[in-house]
UniProtKB/Swiss-Prot annotation:
ATP binds at G27, L28, S29, G30, A31, G32, K33, S34. The keyword ATP-binding applies. It comes from Gluconobacter oxydans (strain 621H). Keywords: ATP-binding, GTP-binding, Nucleotide-binding. GTP binds at D72, V73, R74, S75. The keyword Acetylation does not apply. InterPro entries: P-loop_NTPase, RapZ-like, RapZ-like_N, RapZ_C. This is Nucleotide-binding protein GOX0815. GO terms for molecular function: ATP binding; GTP binding. Displays ATPase and GTPase activities. Belongs to the RapZ-like family.
Length: 321
């Protein structure tokens, strides 16, 4: 189960500590492009929204900080094919890491947002909004197909969208595969950004133990309870073996991000235990880049926040010659 992240051209082995980040942010109207740009600006990126396409190279060629450029159907001279051509030209710039971000949401969600804000859809002058959403989806389809990261905001509240962007782009890390390990609860919905999902609901549930119920998979008593299930060693071993096979292949094909999600009934005990164990073991066995941990349901309840299991390397401490 995946929100497919597509490979980008260029070097993908290790980190390019000296690279400047250039992000092209596009997507459907109402899907959160402006919100993403605001977060990137807070993270220190220079943000330019909707410049004429023929100015993109000039903007990117200027020396300076990381750059985020917003592009959508309102951009002067917009054609998806032209945007992709400009993207390939950007990737020829020296010492630049160039990525395409695409924001999307379900049509009914977009319709609800436009209705709530009373904004006019850029492709609709009169009548209902839905035909405009469908037309824009078709116009932007080539960009979504080539995006390095697709962000579906259908059920992503603004604070979680901000957290997602901060975890992806708030570091100074360079090229490489960033792995996100996420626990979640199935009743709250599948994480749309997940590339791989594993279901841990068949394991013994600590929820039904009165002593363990208020605890989480961050507590040792819960960890030992979950691991005592006879099926746990084989289940975890299969997940570990699969990730040790797949993640290096993701690196080889140029993926920039991989989200591995583990789900259970409440997102509190079993899935948290497994994510924590993966975060402990995988950095020793899989040669990828930064690795982050997010316990979605615990974060929503204020019981945990995202953290780096393997932080991005600090360019100032790079000792390579």
């Amino acid at each position: 189960m995946a929100s497919a992240n597509h490979p980008e051209s260029g070097s993908i082995s290790g980190y390019d500590h000296g690279s400047r980040r250039i992000l092209i942010v596009t997507g459907l109207s109402g899907a959160g492009k402006s919100s993403i740009l605001r977060v990137l600006e807070d993270l220190g990126h220079e943000v330019v929204d909707n410049p004429p396409l023929n100015l993109i190279q000039a903007l990117a060629s200027r020396a300076g900080q990381n750059l985020a450029i917003g592009i959508d159907v309102r951009s002067r001279g917009f054609e998806a094919s032209r945007v992709l051509e400009e993207l390939e030209r950007l990737r020829l710039l020296p010492d630049c890491s160039v990525q395409l971000l695409y924001a999307t949401a379900e049509p009914e969600i977009l319709l609800r947002r436009f209705t709530a804000t009373r904004r006019r859809h850029p492709l609709v002058t009169s009548g209902t909004i839905l035909p405009g959403i469908e037309q824009e989806t078709a116009l932007l389809a080539p960009l979504r197909a080539n995006a390095d990261l697709v962000i579906d905001t259908s059920d992503l509240p603004s604070p979680e969208l901000r957290q997602l962007i901060e975890t992806r782009f708030g570091s100074t890390g360079g090229e490489g595969l960033t792995v996100a390990l996420m626990s979640f609860a199935y009743p709250s919905g599948l994480p749309r950004e997940a590339d791989m999902v594993f279901d841990a609901r068949f394991l013994r549930n600590p929820h039904y133990d009165p002593t363990l119920q208020p605890m989480t998979g961050l507590d040792e008593a819960v960890v030992q309870y979950v691991k005592s299930d006879p099926a746990y060693p084989a289940f975890f071993g299969h997940i570990q073996s699969l990730l040790e096979l797949v993640l290096p292949r993701f690196v080889a094909e140029g993926k920039k991000y991989a989200t591995i999600a583990i789900g259970c009934s409440g997102g509190r005990h079993r899935s948290v235990t497994i994510v924590e164990e993966l975060a402990r073991i995988l950095p020793k066995t899989v040669p990828v880049g930064p690795m982050m941990v997010l316990h979605r349901e615990l974060a929503r309840k204020g019981l945990a926040s995202w953290r780096w299991a393997v932080p991005p390397q600090d360019p100032s401490q790079d000792t390579t010659v």
